[in-house]
From Swiss-Prot:
Gene3D superfamilies: tt1808, chain A. To Synechocystis PCC 6803 sll1609 and sll0925. Coiled coil: none annotated. It comes from the Bacteria. This is Uncharacterized protein sll0925. PANTHER family: GLR1098 PROTEIN, RESTRICTION ENDONUCLEASE DOMAIN-CONTAINING PROTEIN-RELATED. It holds the Pfam family Uma2.
Length: 202
């Protein structure tokens, strides 16, 4: 991510106003606004596959799945992030809002440039959301999905699913999705050997 300005402070309201008129997505961290670069093809296919898998399973559940363009509000408005996908089952998260306050599940498709942030500081911030039950990381270099599930004791339990034969159990939504569905149409080993790991900045 690249800071929009290294000088001065933007209030949350400043950020939301600027973002409503911007053609480029930005994240907001403690008064600074950071531009986000576009994603690559592998990233988009994985995100789209996961969105379709969730949407088809959640249609009559009262939960909604959002894809890429909806922010999550954190730290009482001091931070706003754009996850690749999120699911909210809280009626207070109206579809007309520009951001979600009560996500149940957040999903990030990993890229080489942001994997450290997604696993580290961003996950640390997401864990402050009482509504969040699961944080899911999807690898774009190999067939691997990591599900971090919050326990009743407020610990986070990791379950990893590897290989196209595996089925990811998303307990927070009471559903399971085969990795073959998440990675549909992708031959990752061949693609990674050909072009290397994608370097988008989402």
């Amino acid at each position: 991510m690249v800071a929009l300005s290294s000088n001065g402070y933007f209030s949350p309201d400043d950020y939301l106003e600027l973002e409503s008129r911007s053609d480029v997505k930005h994240e907001y961290i403690d008064g600074q606004i950071y531009a986000m670069a576009g994603t690559g093809g592998i990233h988009n296919i994985i995100s789209g596959n996961f969105y379709m898998a969730l949407r088809s399973r959640l249609q009559n559940s009262g939960c909604r799945v959002y894809f890429a363009d909806l922010k999550v509000k954190l730290k009482e408005g001091r931070r706003f992030y754009y996850p690749d996908l999120l699911v909210t089952c809280d009626e207070r998260d109206a579809p007309s809002q520009a951001f979600v306050n009560f996500p149940r599940v957040i999903i990030e498709v990993l890229s080489e440039s942001t994997e450290g942030f997604d696993r580290g500081k961003k996950f640390q911030d997401y864990r402050t959301l009482p509504s969040l039950w699961a944080y899911i990381l999807v690898n774009a270099q190999q067939y691997l999905v990591e599900c971090f599930q919050r326990t009743p004791q407020d610990f986070w339990l990791l379950k990893s699913y590897e290989g196209l034969e595996a089925i990811a159990d998303i307990e927070a939504l009471n559903l399971a999705i085969p990795l073959a569905e998440i990675y549909a149409t992708l031959n990752l080993p061949a693609l990674v050997d050909e072009v290397g790991m994608e370097t988008d900045l989402t």
